[in-house]
Structure formats: structure tokens, C-alpha cells
Amino acid sequence: MRIIRTVDEMKKLHREICGPVGLVPTMGYLHEGHLSLVRASKKQDINTVASIFVNPTQFGPHEDFKKYPRDEKRDMAMLENAGVDYVFAPSVEDMYPAGFDSWVEPGILQQCLEGAIRPGHFRGVCTVVAKLFTIIRPDRAYFGQKDYQQYLIIKRMASDLNLDVSVEMLPIIRENDGLALSSRNTYLSPAERQAALVLYRSLLTARSLFDEKEHRAEVIRKKMTDVIQHESMAEIDYVSLSHQDTLCESDEVSAKTIALVAARFGKTRLIDNMFLA
């Protein structure tokens, strides 16, 4: 496995690589969810590149950029064991040099859910991902379903800007008890971690009601909210039943509906989602 530290070196490497390239963009502190993306790339692509970059521009002024968990030595060992060919781990100064002043601003898909609660977040995400696509020139890029809104926005960006990359989504990887894997889970106390299982239970409630032929979004949304509110440690940010292509809130749920939830447990904010069909 080769480690690349600079943009110039990565661009030079691209000219030397033969065969399809798969990109797994990460912010490090890897878990099994990231490794599932690596395995998907290994199945389809001759060359797999993983990036490790904690992107400051997608964090708000009162968010956890400085506290975001980092362990590069551990990450590198995990990626090497997973068979990654190249790791791109640039510095903030190289990705955003002095005078940097160009941004990719997503459109309507950022106006709800995460975008409404975290202003500017998706501008930072789209800008750094566009830069990674331009620097690495992957044939495919792999993202997890847990950040579903991010996946939709990046897929739209790649299409709108004619970026020659296929944006792929892989299912959420969960712990045995249903908690969606997230680098931020490390922030949780034992009690908060137990409380956080309520997000998964709320999603299962939505799917169960849909399976029982309940199609009224208002009814399902209330049941989901009741499940989460029953946990005293949970502070809800949103409970959404949205069309999976547009993220528009649904009045009547269908096989094209996705349930999305976000809540805070102590100082830790978690998100999760589930397709109803």
C-alpha cells in the first residue's frame, strides 16, 4: 500500500495508474462501514484509493472539528489489511491553500434535514468531494447509506457538473443490536450508547407500520416520534418520511419512501435511516 501526502503527488500517480480506479472517501477513524466500501471497490476496480481527510469546511463553528476522532496509524493498518492500494492523506494547507475562494454550492437537496440544521455543511462536503474527484479521477466512488442526503447531493453534483464518475451507495452496517456504525459513536457514554438504540427502533416501527399497510405519513411519523421521545436522553432534531429521490416530505408513504431520523444524546449527534420497502 502506498501513502500519498500531497495533491501534486496524487495527480502524478493518476497518470501512472492503469485500469479502473475506485475511491473510498473517509474522514478517518475507520470502522466496518468504511471497510465494506473498500470491499465493494475491490470487487469492481483494479485500483482502490482511500482518502483520509478531516474536512474543516463541512464543520460549523460550534461543531466537533477539533474533537473529531483521529488515529491515522490505526486507519492505515486497517486499510492495508483490507487490501487498499493507495491512501491519499493530504494536509488542510494543501487542500485549501492560502487564497482559496471557490466553492461548490448544492441546490434544493440541501435545504432540508441535515442542510437545514447545519448551514454550509453540504457546501463544504461538495467542495471537498469535487476536489477529490478532480485530483484522483476515480471511475467509481463509494458512499454509505447512513449519510443518505449526502449521497444524493454528491450524485446530483457529479451529474450536473459532468464529472466522469459513478457514485455508488452501499447499505448501512450496524452493530448486532442495530446501532448504525459511526465514527462519532466513540463519543457516547455506555448509557448514551444504550439510549441511541432508540433511533433504530423508531425506524423499525416505521417499516412495521408500512408492512401493516399504514400509509398515512402523519400516523407513522407520530409513532416514530413517540418511540424516540420515550427515551429521556434523546433530543430529537428531526423525524422525516421523505421521497427517496427528492427528499420531499411525504403525506402518503410508499415503496419510494425513506425514513430518516436525527437526535442528540448528550453532546453526540447521530443520524440514521431506513427504506420502508
UniProtKB/Swiss-Prot annotation:
One Pfam family recorded for the sequence: Pantoate_ligase
**The organism's taxonomic lineage, starting at the top:** Bacteria, Bacillati, Chloroflexota, Dehalococcoidia, Dehalococcoidales
Q: Which SUPFAM superfamilies match?
A: Nucleotidylyl transferase
- Identify the residues that bind (R)-pantoate: Q58, Q150
Judged by the first EC level, this protein's enzyme class is: ligase
Role played: Catalyzes the condensation of pantoate with beta-alanine in an ATP-dependent reaction via a pantoyl-adenylate intermediate.
The pathway it acts in is: Cofactor biosynthesis; (R)-pantothenate biosynthesis; (R)-pantothenate from (R)-pantoate and beta-alanine: step 1/1
Q: Which gene encodes it?
A: panC
The record's misc note reads: The reaction proceeds by a bi uni uni bi ping pong mechanism.
Family statement drawn from the similarity comment of this UniProt entry: Belongs to the pantothenate synthetase family.
Name it.
Pantothenate synthetase
GO CC terms? cytosol
Binding residues annotated for beta-alanine, in chain numbering: Q58
